[in-house]
UniProtKB/Swiss-Prot annotation:
The gene is rps8. The keyword RNA-binding applies. InterPro entries: Ribosomal_uS8, Ribosomal_uS8_CS, Ribosomal_uS8_sf. GO terms for molecular function: rRNA binding; structural constituent of ribosome. Belongs to the universal ribosomal protein uS8 family. One of the primary rRNA binding proteins, it binds directly to 16S rRNA central domain where it helps coordinate assembly of the platform of the 30S subunit. It comes from the Archaea. This is Small ribosomal subunit protein uS8. Keywords: Ribonucleoprotein, Ribosomal protein, RNA-binding, rRNA-binding. It comes from Caldivirga maquilingensis (strain ATCC 700844 / DSM 13496 / JCM 10307 / IC-167). NCBIfam families: PRK04034.1. GO terms for biological process: translation. One of its GO terms (cellular component) is ribosome. Part of the 30S ribosomal subunit.
Length: 130
């Protein structure tokens, strides 16, 4: 099977495990971007602890699920967003005000849309979670 987008594959693995009611999911293959996205999701309480396990084939993440994710997905194509345009993208991808987060890659690292607005930085949209 050809993996074209490892982030999208990882987020779909989390979504499928959540819908089955699993308490943990193994994400393979892994990347630094996946680790940073998981860190943002952990900061907002969507996933529990996670750890990187190196297995000699690129590594994998073992993620503890909390059952708090209703929907999650990668945003494709990856849109470049200015800080003033974040409201428009919130309305497009999130179900209501103050519900969920958009995840962006910025010059300050991988952050949520709330942190990007606070730091006044734009970036590239990569995912949404609520």
């Amino acid at each position: 099977m050809v993996m074209l987008d490892v982030l999208s594959n990882a987020l779909m693995s989390v979504k499928n495990a959540e819908s089955r009611g699993d308490r943990q999911v193994i994400i393979w293959p892994s990347s630094k971007l996946i680790g940073n996205v998981l860190r943002v999701m952990q900061r907002y309480g969507y996933v529990g602890e996670f750890e990187y396990v190196y297995d000699g084939r690129g590594g994998k993440y073992v993620v503890q699920l909390l059952g708090r994710i209703n929907d999650i997905g990668a945003i494709k194509p990856r849109f470049h967003v200015k800080v003033d345009e974040l409201q428009k993208w919130e309305e497009k991808y999130l179900p209501a005000r103050q519900v969920g987060i958009l995840i962006l890659t910025t010059s300050k690292g991988v952050v949520s849309h709330l942190e990007a607005r606070e730091n006044r930085v734009g970036g590239i949209l990569v995912a949404y979670v609520y």
